């Protein structure tokens, strides 16, 4: 089936892409063109000297006389082509054999004679490895070149960015105002000075911040105040406990005592507000009570406090046991001497009574007294007698009277102002008395059958009638009489009192010195102050620490109240025993208290050291523990001692002073009032709100804490003096034999001990308050820690600011340098020496084009090499014969040596080689102008190889700019136009038909040849006509002159020269224009400048003159080495057209 196709489609089929030719389609196309233009019958006349028409060396030579054979040109063409094809087939077969490694059996079979198949196999392997190495090197070179292109692209972008920045800076610099710069410099100086001052302030602030103590070393006034005076601490204040009270009597003598001498009742006036100290010989009930309180304290506060309490109680018991043993020994030794002294004391009783009648009567004031079990007993209780008539019973001998020592602190009288002296329910042992109501009650008698004893239900109030000062002479006569009668039976004078002159009555006592006492809460209405009394005169329960007492046994055995006391049996032995017991108890108490005072001082020092060594987070707990235990190592609610409890300076007595004492003495009354300054300070400290008030309160409390060691030392000394004074008074009483002096002395000693107990109680209260306040300081440490963190953050900010200031100092501009730069004017001469941007871009573009052309060549060579290798392997696998390898190997080695030498040495021709001398390359001729002998070089050696370059390929747009691609396209069009012109010029010579894969006329179609190429080291002789070409001639004067051998065809020759120089080297166009466009080196380096124009292609001088002048601002571009070196002899023989023919492969 036939079909039609256009010539355009047939061209696309014949040449589908660059480097690919379909010869059958091309043959059909050419045949169609010849038929269309009707030249199929035209003939071409050949000279017969064409290279491709020459026969092979093994041509038949006719003998002499034979007719010369007629040579058929087509047959000759077929013979040449067949030879080439046969050789290529042999090469392919040889290459196939070389690629396949022979087996061992094949090697053994072929190893005969001169054949060495093993060596040949080894050589083949080495050739393959070399080819692979070359491929790897080429790939690496390609990658390196691509990296270089990428770097150049980045450099180009950087240059553009720098240029933009320079333009911007230049624009800004043009707009800079010198006056503004001067003002800016002044501002910078001012800011620099300010920064210097700020830096100094920052350094000062840093020093201050470093001087701030650590959080654990700081205590705020408000935190210390809350820790010392918080409401929670008020609940922990010490209250008087029942531990101080006892239902038992003083320990008796180990000797036997009669029943009637069990108790001797002596009323003793006292003004102390707290009970006496507990006896050393405590019972099991008291120990149980102490342990119970320790357990309760451990449950409510801390286990450490209870443990300390128990340990102190055990130590106290051991001290009591040792002291009791010592006392028994001492009592046994001193019993005889005491008996004698008491006998003398009985004799002086009557004398004392007579003196007591004439002595002035001291007016007592209300005050506290110790009860029967060492608890405060106050005024007459309601229900016992009416408040308006508290008269002394007339019939004291009756059996239904109330015991006066149980009524209250004053004796009953007829009015509210009747003085009522205190009577202890458990009286101290003293001398015997004839007063009936002082006799002891029988055993089992119940006191106060209608009264319940209550503990903490008493409020501190002033009773009516005792709020105003009352002089002695203003008292009612009835009351005075009653009191006088009472004083006849009770010794009231003779013992010195603190603050009261000896033997002098106290006539007036202000109401401020009246101590407060307690009344039942439900009965306060009976003792309210009168309306005309100011509120300040009325005591409240907040003015003194709350006293906590244990409830005692209630006596309600009414049937026994009417029993009359049995008559007391008198006996000096029982009185002596009781006195001995009392003296021993007092001495033991003084010794025990002195021992405990020493241990308390040591414990206080240990507590201070423990508080100093404890960590900050446990400071509050440790301080509270130590403060609650007290300086004596135990709790104050059962020890009861202190400077503020009424302890005063000691009053030493010697024997001379004691002898001068009168036998009659005033009532042992030493009123104790709580310190109003201390109470008011505690109240104001608890109610403080402002920081200044808290600071003052804390300072006041800390001042008392600082005085504790000195007060303990003073207490120790005072107890020593008291013990000495007690011994002196006891000796005096024993010598004098006065029962009144002995009772007064014991009463004074008891009063001082009670005062010491109260002082101790107040100190313990302060210590507990301070301990609880220290416990709350822990919460303030957190606030302080947060404040320190904020300070640390500010310090970091200050450090950053300092670093910025230092950086500004380093990078700040210098005004002098700026002024010099601003005042400096642009120098045109220096600007002329700088590079021009247009020139720089031009040079960069030329370099880019040169590099891309090199890359294009390398790519083309690589593809051609791969294709040639592929075809060779394919053809050798199918056509090569093993027996022809030896001759082919030699031919290949020769070709390889030549090609490698040309590639490495740049196709240089060495006239001194052995081949040059053998072929006599130089001929002796004479110069046409001066007849001087000249050596003329013969024609160059021609080399014909397979073409591997093909047409130029356009690189992708990603690797090259658009301008370069456009120039490359223009260059290819010009080259194509040159080829067309050259083909038309040669067209008149005629050519033969070329069918199939036969040879072609390379003179007319050399731009289409892609298989074979001929190399001319000194240029293509067909492109240069030496008769009409312009040559350089060396004259006699040594100057080179330009000229032609003939003036004909000058213009056409020039055109041919211009067309031939398209792909020449930039600096040597007269050497590169000799290379054929279709040869291996045809696509040479492109010109660096697109504006380059060449007017002469034969000399270096003409090429230099026609090159575009470079701008003066650019340095000369370094020239690449010439591909073909210039001949050392610049003279060429004109007119010689004789050339050597190129050898065939």
Swiss-Prot record:
Residues 1100-1111 have a biased composition (Low complexity). Residues 489-577, 1100-1145 are annotated as: Disordered. It holds the Pfam family DUF4795. Residues 504-569 have a biased composition (Basic and acidic residues). Residues 74-101, 186-212, 744-816 form a coiled coil. Keywords: Coiled coil. Residues 1112-1124 have a biased composition (Pro residues). PANTHER family: CHROMOSOME 16 OPEN READING FRAME 96 (PTHR47080:SF1). This is Uncharacterized protein C16orf96 homolog. It comes from Mus musculus.
